[in-house]
């Protein structure tokens, strides 16, 4: 009878086990530790070291769209910068030299408003030069503020030498780019209607306009036909009663500027007669709108006197409803529709783009009776000195008094607002400078580039920017502001022509700006540049639209910095930039270079809360990136961003962040297991050739190679949520749920220097080398934390390496991948049966179970390949496989039945397997025969698992 192990004769076998050990902490504590790592990295010039590692390699340039240098960064900024950083780091891992030069947009109204709060308005409390100096200082302070936050997120770049649109050199190059566009014939002056913010006192770019609901006065106004005989002749019907062509408008204040009424040549119209309290009245309305219009006028029973096309009435004279001395013509326009209103459009070329365009055809006067402050000018025919919004009710009252108001009702409709002030804008014609979309074929060239030269992620970005380019008006590039790059033109006082030396003068001004900044222009007079010609020329004192500043960075940054290329490989911004930076960059580059400034455009969605609402102070739902970093660290923030599908709106909130944290922990714990089990492993002496590895280890490396293909392709396609899914799924399914669980026994219980253990460690070594690289573009801090803990690491930073070459067995694997997939399915089915037996109190842990399997022929042969090692795969103490019979319990697998019972024998104190031979060896009480061989003998031999 063998001696049983008792407390008195117990031997401590712990020292004979190969226990894991690593400095890689279980608890990340990222919020604290990341700060320390950043200090070390930047003290070591990490960005420069990454660049140095790629000298001579093919370039990949992601050009940074400059955020505005004003205020703390928000979550949208974080999404944008982290996505860019992931792309740059993954391209470096691909072997590219991928420089990243961050930039800031530094001119413009928001900065002016902030500075006005401190020093007052220009010309009131401060002169323009002092004001510009204060603007420059403020912008620089905001750059410093935002730069710290971007660095804190682990975004690598040339933070010490970013581009700023207010740098003297860049201001000069912005002026030079203007000169190039002027030289190419795309710039022209004009009195044209532009988006105008009364509060800003300036024109607005298309990208500075937002649409919000607004309550307006909708009115139907009659323009009386002056010559009824002319009308009768045109319609071939006798017309004797008063006849109005009725327009419908929501901007009564624009009626003093009316110059015409537009119909559509091909729309069907009707002359209808009704009886009103004013007597017999005729209306001319679109046929499809007669019923709704007459009902709106609270009239009944219209009698149709004539049907005709709009073209019949071209140039018919109408009486202006407010101005007795003004008659206006009927004109024809393609913009007129018959789906709402009356089918007739009030036309004021000074107050609308369509009106302006059709006015050019008919040579209509571009009348603008409204000043930049929203007050009617002294030259206005009526309501001079009155604010337009205060004049609205007066205009409506006057129309009623003259009998020209047929309907008046308030409506709520979508209306353009200033993005800064959130107030309604107006359209007003002012003398401005424009980049013409069609004079030199700019629109056509831009559309051709979109169609043929640019790739889009996601695909719908193409249609979006295409439709915007197709429909956009000429680009008004001039602004009446103080803090901006000048338009250094000299305009002849009589002819309005530019000075004949304009190209040379622009270069002269640019050279001065390069040394003195924009004050070089504003602080000099015309005679300083053109001498005696100053008597005949005015110097333009307008500034450039800030979208021109950022839109010409392909010229002022990409072309000027030797580490960058023009065109760039990629521009990446939020979806609002199809009408902003993407468009301004495309148009200026086409104008200068006749090609796009980018090969690809990537668009990301906006951040919303868990209810799908945009974040705003009023809703109290703002989450800042700083708050997330305090809680989850920058890697937590980065993982949330990467795991979201940025093509759509990105949801932020506690539940979403909790899921991201869970995913991060899964990856971190897996990484810790890999590192811990490399304890004592020296790759140069202990690693085995892949063809000599145990079958299971060969399989996991083959799976890792497949995952790496998915990861690399996902990075290349910029599908980072697929990368995150691939990482977490590999951790959960392939490693945590299968491989790592199985190898624990081999890792801990076999001889330390055995081939069985070294086989597993060789696989783990290759896995961790690949795994850390996979995660490094996204989980940069955690990847670099783990990197130096990999045995015999030679590179200082993971960021200077390339994708790992995972070795895959060249000979036919001992067990095919298909058979391993079958074994995984069997393992899952067996585990469910063990769980059921555990719930029935038949067994405790898996190792206390005996598994009996009845399998059909093909399945049986797969299982029998492993022989006795099948128990290691199933993580049970005993397994028997029999030909298929109706015994045991059926499972989810066809042809597989399983019976679970308590394993026979006793529990080994070292490996915890329950085996009959435990305590049968007097010299080794408590041990199984396998452990005795591993402790005192040559060690067990494994072939499969």
Swiss-Prot record:
Its EC number is 6.1.1.5. Its main location: cytoplasm. Zn(2+) binds at residues 908, 911, 928, 931. Binds 1 zinc ion per subunit. Keywords: Aminoacyl-tRNA synthetase, ATP-binding, Cytoplasm, Ligase, Metal-binding, Nucleotide-binding, Protein biosynthesis, Zinc. It catalyses: tRNA(Ile) + L-isoleucine + ATP = L-isoleucyl-tRNA(Ile) + AMP + diphosphate. ATP binds at residue 617. GO terms for cellular component: cytosol. It is found in: Cytoplasm. A motif ('KMSKS' region) lies at residues 614-618. The keyword DNA repair does not apply. It is an enzyme of class 6 (ligase). Its cofactor is Zn(2+). One of its GO terms (biological process) is isoleucyl-tRNA aminoacylation. Catalyzes the attachment of isoleucine to tRNA(Ile). As IleRS can inadvertently accommodate and process structurally similar amino acids such as valine, to avoid such errors it has two additional distinct tRNA(Ile)-dependent editing activities. One activity is designated as 'pretransfer' editing and involves the hydrolysis of activated Val-AMP. The other activity is designated 'posttransfer' editing and involves deacylation of mischarged Val-tRNA(Ile). Belongs to the class-I aminoacyl-tRNA synthetase family. IleS type 1 subfamily. IleRS has two distinct active sites: one for aminoacylation and one for editing. The misactivated valine is translocated from the active site to the editing site, which sterically excludes the correctly activated isoleucine. The single editing site contains two valyl binding pockets, one specific for each substrate (Val-AMP or Val-tRNA(Ile)). This is Isoleucine--tRNA ligase. The gene is ileS.
């Amino acid at each position: 009878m063998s001696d049983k192990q008792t407390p008195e004769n117990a031997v401590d076998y712990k020292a004979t086990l190969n226990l894991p050990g690593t400095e890689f902490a279980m608890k990340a504590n990222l919020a604290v530790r990341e700060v320390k790592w950043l200090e070390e990295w930047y003290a070591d010039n990490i960005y420069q070291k990454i660049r140095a590692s790629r000298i001579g390699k093919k370039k990949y340039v992601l050009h940074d769209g400059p955020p505005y240098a004003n205020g703390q960064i928000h979550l949208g900024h974080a999404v944008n910068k982290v996505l860019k950083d992931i792309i740059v780091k993954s391209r470096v891992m691909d072997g590219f030299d991928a420089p990243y030069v961050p930039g800031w947009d530094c001119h413009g109204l928001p900065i002016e408003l902030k500075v006005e709060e401190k020093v007052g308005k220009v010309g009131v409390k401060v002169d323009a030069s002092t004001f510009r100096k204060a603007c420059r200082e403020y912008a620089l302070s905001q750059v410093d503020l935002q730069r710290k936050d971007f660095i804190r997120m682990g975004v690598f770049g040339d933070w010490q030498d970013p581009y700023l649109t207010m740098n003297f050199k860049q201001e000069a190059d912005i002026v030079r780019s203007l000169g190039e566009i002027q030289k190419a014939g795309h710039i022209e002056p004009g009195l044209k209607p532009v988006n105008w913010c009364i509060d800003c006192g300036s024109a607005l770019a298309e990208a500075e306009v937002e649409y919000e609901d607004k309550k307006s006065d909708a009115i139907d106004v009659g323009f009386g036909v002056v010559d009824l005989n002319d009308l009768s002749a045109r319609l071939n019907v006798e017309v004797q009663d008063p006849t109005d062509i009725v327009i419908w408008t929501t901007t009564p204040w624009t009626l003093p500027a009316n110059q015409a009424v537009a119909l559509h040549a091909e729309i069907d119209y009707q002359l209808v007669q009704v009886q009103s309290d004013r007597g017999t009245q005729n209306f001319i309305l679109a046929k499809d709108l007669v019923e709704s219009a007459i009902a709106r006028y609270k009239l009944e029973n219209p009698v149709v006197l004539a049907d005709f096309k709009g073209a019949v009435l071209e140039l018919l004279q109408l009486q202006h409803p407010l101005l007795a001395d003004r008659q206006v013509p009927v004109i024809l326009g393609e913009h007129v529709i018959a789906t709402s209103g009356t089918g007739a459009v009030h036309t004021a070329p000074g107050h609308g783009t369509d009106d302006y365009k059709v006015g050019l055809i008919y040579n209509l006067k571009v009348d603008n009776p409204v000043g930049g402050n929203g007050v009617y000018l002294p030259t206005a025919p009526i309501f001079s000195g009155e604010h337009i919004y205060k004049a609205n009710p007066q205009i409506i009252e006057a129309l009623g008094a003259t009998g020209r108001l047929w309907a008046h009702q308030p409506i709520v409709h979508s209306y353009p607002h200033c993005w800064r002030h959130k107030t309604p804008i107006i359209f007003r014609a002012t003398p401005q400078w424009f980049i013409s979309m069609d004079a030199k074929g700019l629109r056509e060239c831009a559309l051709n580039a979109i169609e043929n030269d640019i790739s889009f992620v996601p695909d719908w970005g193409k249609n979006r920017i295409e439709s915007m380019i197709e429909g956009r008006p000429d680009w008004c590039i001039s602004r009446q502001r103080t803090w901006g790059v000048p338009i250094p033109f000299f305009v002849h006082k009589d002819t309005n022509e530019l000075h004949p030396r304009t190209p040379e003068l622009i270069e002269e001004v640019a050279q001065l700006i390069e040394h003195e900044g924009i004050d070089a222009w504003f602080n000099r007079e015309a005679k300083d540049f053109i001498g005696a010609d100053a008597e005949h020329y005015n110097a333009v004192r307008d500034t450039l639209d800030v979208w021109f500043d950022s839109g010409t960075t392909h010229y002022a940054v990409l072309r000027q910095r030797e580490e960058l290329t023009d065109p760039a490989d990629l521009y990446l911004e939020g979806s609002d930039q199809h009408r902003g930076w993407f468009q301004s960059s495309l148009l200026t580059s086409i104008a200068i270079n006749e090609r796009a400034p980018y090969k690809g455009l990537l668009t990301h969605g906006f951040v919303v809360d868990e209810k799908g609402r945009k974040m705003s102070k009023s809703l109290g739902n703002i989450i800042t990136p700083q708050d997330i970093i305090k809680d989850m660290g920058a890697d937590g923030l980065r993982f949330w961003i990467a795991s979201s599908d940025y093509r759509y709106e990105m949801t932020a909130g506690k539940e979403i962040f909790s899921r991201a944290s869970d995913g991060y922990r899964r990856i971190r714990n897996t990484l810790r297991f890999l590192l811990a089990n490399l304890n004592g492993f020296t790759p140069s002496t202990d690693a085995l050739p892949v063809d000599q590895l145990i079958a299971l280890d060969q399989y996991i490396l083959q799976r890792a190679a497949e995952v790496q293909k998915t990861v690399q392709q996902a990075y290349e396609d910029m599908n980072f949520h697929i990368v995150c899914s691939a990482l977490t799924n590999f951790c959960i399914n392939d490693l945590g749920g299968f491989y790592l669980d199985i190898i624990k026994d081999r890792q801990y219980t076999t001889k330390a220097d055995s081939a069985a253990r070294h086989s597993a460690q060789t696989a783990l070594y290759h896995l961790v080398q690949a795994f850390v690289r996979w995660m490094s573009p996204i989980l940069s801090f955690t990847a670099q934390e783990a990197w130096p803990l990999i045995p015999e690491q030679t590179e200082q930073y993971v960021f200077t390496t390339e994708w790992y070459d995972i070795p895959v067995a060249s000979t036919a694997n001992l067990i095919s991948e298909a058979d391993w997939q079958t074994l995984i399915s069997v393992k899952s089915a067996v585990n469910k049966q063990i769980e059921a037996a555990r719930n029935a109190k038949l067994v405790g842990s898996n190792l206390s179970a005996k598994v009996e399997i009845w399998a059909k022929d093909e399945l049986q042969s797969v299982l029998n390949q492993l022989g006795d090692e099948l128990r290691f795969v199933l993580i049970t103490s005993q397994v028997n496989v029999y030909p298929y019979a109706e015994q045991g319990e059926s499972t989810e697998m066809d042809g597989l039945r399983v019976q679970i019972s308590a394993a026979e024998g006793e529990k080994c104190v070292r490996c915890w397997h329950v085996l009959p031979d435990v305590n049968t060896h007097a010299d080794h009480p408590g041990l199984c025969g396998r452990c005795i061989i591993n402790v005192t003998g040559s060690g067990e031999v494994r072939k499969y698992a």
